[in-house]
Amino acid sequence: MLDEFERGKDWELLTRFAQAYRSLSDELMDQITLHRSQAMVLCKLFAQDGMTQSEIAQQLAVQGATVTDMLQRMEDAGLVSRRRDLEDNRLVRVYLTEAGRDKERFIMEQFLKLEGAVFAGFSESERALLRQLINRALDYMDLKA
């Protein structure tokens, strides 16, 4: 069983990893003039254009108001457009513009660079194990939420 000191080191290690990951992610997204969260929204729309704002919020695990503000900035930048659903006027759907679609290749390149930096020096089996452990930790954290 880990003593308190060792548990504290785990917390410190996870914090350092999260900060380094966020910092590198921000740096890479800055190169293509996007914020990390905007890139994540665009990735969701690359997979399923026309999602509702609430679907985006749910998939990104953020508050609806956060997505509304972010989408406003993205709309102002010409990356997305928002339109009322034709069948259910209560819903607002989000669509990629041509400028938003044009970002896909650049975003994927940056995410591949990020992934490469994170997993540099890892074998395929180590990468698979790390993914498994992270997913297990996330599942457990979801149960606690």
List PLM regions with ranges.
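C-terminal regulatory/oligomerization modules of transcriptional regulators
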Residues: 1-4, 124-145
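Pre-recognition alpha-helix immediately N-terminal to the DNA-recognition helix
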Residues: 13, 24, 40-43, 102, ...
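Charged, amphipathic alpha-helical coiled-coil/dimerization segments
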Residues: 22, 72-135
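Short, locally clustered residues in the helix-turn-helix/winged-helix DNA-binding domain
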Residues: 15-18, 43-47, 108, 135
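N-terminal helix-turn-helix DNA-binding core of bacterial DNA-binding proteins
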Residues: 23-66
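N-terminal leader segment of winged-helix/HTH proteins
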Residues: 1-32
